[in-house]
């Protein structure tokens, strides 16, 4: 019973990471105000650790660091589902 829940949790986490990894900055992120732009650099005295900037950094990190590992993980999950699914 616990293993069934962990498997579903793994699939949900993998799906969410895949969703963040494929977000297009030009098409989607800029429309909702989460694109990386140089004209929004904070001036002296402004806090640059806002929630919005942290979300933009998290999306950029996921897209940069997890793109190649996600390809391998997705291939393993597809093969697992085809053989044992």
Curated annotation (Swiss-Prot):
Example GO BP: endoplasmic reticulum to Golgi vesicle-mediated transport
Localization terms from the record: Endoplasmic reticulum membrane; Golgi apparatus membrane
Keywords assigned by UniProt, alphabetized: Endoplasmic reticulum, ER-Golgi transport, Golgi apparatus, Membrane, Protein transport, Transmembrane, Transmembrane helix, Transport
Native species: Saccharomyces cerevisiae (strain ATCC 204508 / S288c) (Baker's yeast)
One Gene Ontology cellular component annotation held by this UniProt entry: COPII-coated ER to Golgi transport vesicle
Membrane topology: Multi-pass membrane protein
Protein name as annotated: Protein transport protein YOS1
Spans traversing the lipid bilayer: 2-22, 65-85
Family: Belongs to the YOS1 family.
Assembly, per entry: Component of the YIP1-YIF1 complex, composed of at least YIF1, YIP1 and YOS1.
Keyword check for Membrane: yes
Function: Required for protein transport between endoplasmic reticulum and Golgi apparatus.
InterPro entries with a match to the protein in the record: Yos1
């Amino acid at each position: 019973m616990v293993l069934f829940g962990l498997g579903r949790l793994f699939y949900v986490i993998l799906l969410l990471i895949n969703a963040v990894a494929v977000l297009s900055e030009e098409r989607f992120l800029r429309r909702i105000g989460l694109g990386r732009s140089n004209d929004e650099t904070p001036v002296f005295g402004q806090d640059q650790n806002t929630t919005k900037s942290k979300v933009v950094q998290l999306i950029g990190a996921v897209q940069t660091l997890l793109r190649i590992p996600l390809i391998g993980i997705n291939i393993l999950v597809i093969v697992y589902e085809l053989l044992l699914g």
